[in-house]
Amino acid sequence: MSHWFHRNPIKPTEFVKFDLKGVLTTDTCSKICGELRLRRDKLVSQFKNASNDLEEVTKEFNEYLRLFAGFLIEIQSSMVELENKDAGNKNSKLIPLIRFKWGNSMLPQAATEVSDTWFEALSMIQCMAMWLTKHAASMAGKDEVRESDAKECLQCLRQAGGMFQYVKDESSRLSGANEVEGSDFDPKVMETYILTATAEAQEVIVARAIEMKHDDGLISSLAAVTASIFSKADQCLNNLPDESFARWRRYLQLKHHFYLAYAFAFLGQKQLSEDKCGEAVRACKQGIAEYGVAKEMAAMYATATGPGTRIKPEQHLFFRRIEPLLNRHLEKAERENGFIYHQKVPDEIPQLDVEATYGLAKLDSFTYPPPAESWNTAVYSAFDLSKANMPDFSKIKKSKSKLDPVHEEKIYQTEKDPSNSSGCVIA
């Protein structure tokens, strides 16, 4: 069996010393910078393994952001709130003092750099969001997936989507961030990450609805919404180069057609229960057609260029079960229609309900955590800018040197078929 979720590489970055020398006029200032160096290095290392403990990685992530807050905003009191838009927070005087270099998930050969601490903060939040999606995949890949694992998978995807949204909303802080096509700050790429996390969270809900045997109409509608979100994600990447983005796009396309197949399958089942056999025949035939396209996309995905994991979703039980399900429904609809109903089979494709009013995945809004207790007005004032080298205020630019890719641990995936009725490991 193969992974159900495609995953792009984690962002690489250059080691940061936080060596501000004469700017640090007190032991507390030096301690903050020394701790930032250690915490950053540990956090970046944690991102290499998707199976690391969620609570531990989240704690390390929040502690780093809290300690880093004084490099983002002026510390006016020990209880300053970074997210309070009405508090009149000013940018920190420390923003331009350190140069940060980060790579991009989809452009392994292109690193960007700038002397701006918001570049560091937003890049780190992106990294955490990417790790959360990978952790979700590791939860879905266990030999035995319990309900708590499925909930953690859903939680991670919702949190990741909220973080991606936060980065997109705050990216206007960075001059030139959106000028590097295909970078992680390209608006098209950021929106694709948001939509992909949303669609994959929706997948968990669809699987749960199937497993719990909810109303066929509801399942059809949820699957149709999921297909629509995957399609929107794919369309965001329309004009980006195939050599970097083809594999990601084929993944989004196969998921789009796969969930259309499920939507038509359950629409057909609903119509059968309502004695609308002619319409059920048409829905099942359309579902079979969509499944055929999904298989074609899976084959194209296998040879597509671009970074990231190479998965085989067509070998997954959840994928394999849809074809016999459609065939059973079609055979029953045709048989009953031939014997009893004699209804005309419509030529037009049935309309799917994409207006589901409940059961939809909502992203968890991300809020930057408050500054660490180490920060107060006296500590902030003790960073002496008169001792700093002249900052570089230029906008983000491509780095002349490359960054090595992150050597990530392989995400474990069970070889066992799920024992549940839906065939989905995340139900």
From Swiss-Prot:
Q: Which PROSITE patterns match?
A: BRO1
Q: Domain BRO1: where?
A: 1-427
The record ties this protein, via InterPro entries, to: BRO1_dom, BRO1_sf, BROX
Q: Which Gene3D superfamilies does the protein's record reference?
A: alix/aip1 like domains
CDD domains noted in UniProt:
BRO1_Brox_like
Instruction: List the cysteine pairs that form cystine.
Output: none
Family membership: Belongs to the BROX family.
Q: What is this protein called?
A: BRO1 domain-containing protein BROX homolog
Native species of this protein?
A: Caenorhabditis elegans
